[in-house]
Amino acid sequence: TVTKIEGNKIALDQTLFYPLGGGQNWDLGILNGPNGQLNVTEVRGRDTIEHTVDDVFELEVGDEVTGEIDFERRYAHMKMHTAQHLVSGIAYELFDGVRTVGNQIHTDRSRIDFHPIQFTEEMLLELQSEVNDKIQQGLEVTDSQMTRDEINAIMPQERTNMDLLPAFINDLLVITIGEQQDM
């Protein structure tokens, strides 16, 4: 249901569209409304998620809409995000607790920011080899919800980067790749 319209930005009472955040780009897709389809070109927000759509549309607050995400794009982001967790976890283990302090996830490439470390070519080759080895093993990837306290009880604080997350976020998604957990 449409709850707010400002220019070409539409807020809904609920959405499956992922907004820009956590180093990951937003979902694209369409909204199907009573007067046709609208292309969703950008999604932003925290408390209120705003879907940017084509400039010309006929919608009013209270209209019922359904959304369809571009699943190919979403799935590419999911795979890149999982790969980021794998690389970050292995780097942490190989290089004395190096922290991932940022990342940027796209459909076809990603960037991971580590601190404190200056990688040598030899270190990068070792990291690449370990990551490729884990991928070749076809390890199972699972996720689970845990609270901050539960995570802090099983993982060292420097591993979780809990200090980089807003304090109001209490429930977190924990990714397990094989036996290795990351968040």
Which residues does each predicted region cover?
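Active-/binding-site microenvironments in catalytic and ligand-binding cores
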Residues: 1-183
